[in-house]
Swiss-Prot record:
Protein's recorded name: 2,3-diketo-L-gulonate reductase
Reactions that this protein is recorded to catalyse: 3-dehydro-L-gulonate + NAD(+) = 2,3-dioxo-L-gulonate + NADH + H(+); 3-dehydro-L-gulonate + NADP(+) = 2,3-dioxo-L-gulonate + NADPH + H(+)
Pfam families: Ldh_2
Keyword Endoplasmic reticulum: no
Family: Belongs to the LDH2/MDH2 oxidoreductase family. DlgD subfamily.
Predominant localisation class: cytoplasm
Organism: Salmonella heidelberg (strain SL476)
Record's signal peptide: none
Positions of transmembrane segments: none
Subcellular location: Cytoplasm
Keywords from the named record: Cytoplasm, NAD, Oxidoreductase
Record-listed E.C. numbers: 1.1.1.130
Length: 332
């Protein structure tokens, strides 16, 4: 089915207000969920909303909590999220990193005691739209086996890097081949994964999303490389925020809350003039996109460039929502 942006935001707002969330908080949160979905990231927008409400109802998320600054060291700050709403807090933290970067050239905010930030790419994009390089990542509950193991002991720990090119170039990737949200998107659509995404119950690589969702044997991105990167991202976020590691979140909490996150902004224009910046970025993009294609019918992609078209299509033709997901939201 298709809905308009206003219908989608209104549905989110209704559910939030029914939980006695303050009007301004409910409006801002509903706006972010709707924008994420409108951008084509259904896995961390509309599809994630029922899970968000479940955690809200369980008390994992404290909607009236206010993040507090703990430590300030010039370009580096440490904050405690107080388990406030994840996407609103993350937006505020990237805004703060940008403010620090405007003063120091670079700004880093380390956040502890946070909740799931939904679409991490929103915060990298937020920085790039203002002319900054945006880098951020989060740890999570243990949902992926480290390389060589069968048992989940590491997080998917998504990493975002956004560049202020035209259009914005952005990598938004979990340390697994696919996020659990994308496994759900493919399962609901009745599709196999385009490449292997995990192991089946016999330890064989599989493209079946439902099998991986069930047994939790998701495949690290780049095999041992994604496993290793997940581990060091967790270590950095834990140390800089003085927050919880994947091990602590998994062993001490009843669900995924109280995670640690990093937000970095770099003001490029303090290092290079605008014309030179644009020319260098354009040369990089042109060099890549003019390569001989492996398949004449498949364009060479630059990361993040597809979002402009996805957003335009959804604004023109309406936002496609899976019927079962929409039914869940209506029932909340």
């Amino acid at each position: 089915m298709k809905v308009t942006f206003e219908e989608l935001k209104g549905a989110f707002y209704r559910v939030l207000r029914s939980r006695n969330i303050a009007e301004d908080t409910a409006d801002a949160c509903a706006e972010m969920f709707a924008r994420t979905t409108e951008s084509g990231v259904y896995s961390h927008g509309v599809n994630r909303f029922p899970r968000f409400i479940q955690q809200l109802d369980n008390g994992d998320i404290i909607p009236d909590a206010k993040p507090q600054r703990v430590t300030s060291l010039g370009a580096i700050e440490q904050w405690d999220a107080q388990r406030a709403i994840g996407n609103l807090t993350a937006k505020k933290m990237m805004d703060r990193a940008i403010e620090l970067a405007s003063d120091h050239g670079i700004g880093l905010v380390a956040l502890r005691n946070a909740n799931h930030w939904m679409r991490g790419g929103s915060y990298g994009w937020q920085a790039a739209e203002r002319g900054y390089i945006g880098i951020c990542w989060t740890n999570s509950i243990a949902v992926m086996p480290p390389w060589g193991a069968k048992e989940c002991r590491i997080g998917t720990n998504p990493l975002i890097v956004a560049i202020p090119s035209t259009p914005i170039t952005m990598v938004d990737m979990s340390m697994s081949m696919f996020s659990y949200g994308m496994l759900e998107v493919n399962r609901l659509a009745g599709r196999e994964l385009p490449v292997d995404g995990g192991f089946d119950d016999n330890g064989q690589l599989t493209k079946e999303p439902g099998v991986i969702e069930k047994n939790r044997r998701i495949l690290p991105m780049g095999y041992w490389k994604g496993s290793g990167l997940s581990i060091v991202l967790d270590m950095i976020a834990t140390l800089l925020s003085n927050g919880s590691s994947v091990a602590e979140v998994t062993q001490e909490n009843s669900d995924e809350y109280g995670v640690s996150q990093i937000f970095i902004a770099i003001e490029v224009d303090k290092l290079i003039d605008g014309a030179t910046r644009d020319a260098k970025l354009q040369r990089i993009m042109d060099f890549i996109t003019t390569a001989e294609r492996a398949d004449d019918n498949v364009a060479i992609r630059l990361p993040g460039h597809e979002f402009t078209k996805l957003l335009d299509d959804n604004r023109r033709h309406g936002i496609t929502i899976d019927d079962s997901v929409w039914a869940k939201i209506q029932a909340l």
